[in-house]
Amino acid sequence: MKIELWGVRGSLPTPLTNNEYQLRVRSIIETALTNSSSKTSIDDIIKLLPSHVSTLYGGNTTCVTVKSRKGNLAILDAGTGLRPLGDQLITEEAGEGKLTANFFFTHTHWDHIQGLPFFKPLYIKGNKFIFNSPIRDLHERLNYQQKFKFFPREFDDTDSVKEFNQLKLNESFTIDDSLIVDFIPLRHPGGSFAYRFREGEKSFIFSTDVEFRGNAVESFTSDHGDFFCSADLLILDSQYTLDEAFAKFDWGHTSYSMAVNCGINWKVKKLVLTHHEPSYSDEKLSSIYSDAQEHMNASAKAAQIEVPELFLATEGMVFDI
């Protein structure tokens, strides 16, 4: 499986501000002046930059793709990250009306569906999309978002073929006899779902918009531990710091420290922290990643156990498992 991240922000899109951009430019110039010599290359300077300057984590809301070994495409959620995905797809078979893809929706809060009206392949005749979710009225919800009073082109009037499939708990959904999909419900206002994708012996879990806290993790693990256990890759909600998670109790999101605990307890191989808080700058996200790595290492040392490889979700990040 090839997993690619197209949108990693939570709640609402977060463009880089002019002030943040100027601070980056200042940092780059200062680093260049401090380390300049006739033998110093541009690449050398870039390597010296702090991660929050050299990397743009991304401001688009949630969208992730899974591509199977057979080339089948699954699209997880339709935040604003769906727009650049669509721009890429129309340079390929979608531009000729030859794309078939499966959507899977965790839930329909705006940051997980707001990119759909701007998904260009949706408007091209011949393309086919299967919309999968446990949500009974998913079609109605997506159609309502594009009512003429809100958007100039209604969802049902787009030119692609659209099919809807309601998933059932404890019943696996299979794509082309190779990619097996399961789901479980999560704790989040209005409800949400985690998806597990399996191909051969490999497994990937997408679990955004969930509030794991305290002893609830133990009870959840006892009920659903097999779902998460030993995944090759887990992308998990980690929107808040621990202090902010306490201040926003019942808002439906997890702290980065609790996300790390979950990854360790479930013995996953790779853990990706995602659904970044929109008010957090890239500098703060870099700091959170460092703190999460420190927490991970301390846990490993204290318990003498193997821990997951840790990543901070970044637009354009790709995993091959």
Task: Describe each PLM feature range.
Residues 203, 213-308:
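Cap/insert and terminal regions of metallo-dependent hydrolase folds
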Residues 76, 106, 206-208, 236-238, ...:
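Active-site flanking residues adjacent to catalytic metal/cofactor-binding acidic residues
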Residues 1-205, 214-215, 225-226, 282-321:
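Binuclear metal-dependent hydrolase catalytic cores
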